[in-house]
Amino acid sequence: MFYTLILENQSGEQVNLSTTANQYKTSKIEGLNPPAGTISTSSYAGMNGSYLNNAFIEKRNVVISFAMRGIGIEKRRHQLYHVVKPSRYIKIWYKTANIDVYAEGYVETCEVSNFEQQISGQISILCPDIYWYSRDIFYAYYSGVIGAFHFPFPESNAPFPLGVYSNSNLFSITNDGDETGFTLRIEALPSDIPQEIVAVTPTIYNENGEYLQIKGDILTGDVITVTTKTGNKTVTLTRNGVDSNILNRLVSGSTWLTLKEGTNIFRVEAVRGVKKLRVTLMHRNSYLGV
């Protein structure tokens, strides 16, 4: 199988472990499969079977075994040490004919045998975030006004639309990976009146009736960014160029919505002004195994 394997540090410096046999020859990559699950059970007193206490997935451990070939091995070994440093952040880029993903973690070890006839090495990377993420970002949009202007520009004197009002409060997006969180951006459409209250208490519903509701006014120029990813759940308001945490405006009963596998349909509502909102949903496909 043809593949590309690149390690990138926090400064953006990279080392390609799949260049040619005269550079690196990767012999084995562990950690591409889904990580093992940890399942805790307790036995029933005097009864067959047991009951489940909890089940979860541990961190991912990516272990790369390789050999170094050709000339200039010592120089390349020091280049490797420069990029892959123990305890430091590292991004793993992995690409095949059908998938292009990355995982993020921290280097546990980077060992190279210096005094053997066949120079070999092994890199161990621990990834607290267990998923592989697609390189591409996928978007879905809702807007109360849909742009209708297009080229070529009409040459007649007849009126033509610059935009049309949307009759639907629905938008959809397809998730080709595993269930995952996403980033939601809610912003007010432009207005001629500074600091005008454009909308009040926007709510996003999924197909199951679960919702995420943010109480309060949205003014001209406001941008609300919601992140629903596990381990990074935030609600941020950007007003006049200043970011502030508005997690306290999340209404009780709200759900941190996620993207299920396949097609997901969402509905946008508000106490008033829903047609004056623009909503953008962004996500990367996430995979437990590649």
Give the location of each predicted region:
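Residues at beta-strand starts and edge strands
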Residues: 1, 58-62, 101, 117-121, ...
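Polar/acidic, low-complexity leader/linker segments enriched in S/T/G and N/D
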Residues: 1-41
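Short amphipathic beta-strand/extended segments with alternating polar/hydrophobic composition
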Residues: 14-23, 101-108, 211-218, 245-252
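Oligomerization/assembly interface segments of phage tail-like spikes and tubes
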Residues: 47-71, 117-130, 264
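Compositionally biased, low-complexity regions
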Residues: 56-57, 61-91, 98
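"Short basic amphipathic alpha-helical interaction patches in structured regions
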Residues: 75-84, 120-122, 137-142
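Short beta-strand and beta-hairpin "edge-sheet" elements
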Residues: 89, 93-136
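Intrinsically disordered, low-complexity segments enriched in serine, threonine, and glycine
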Residues: 140-290
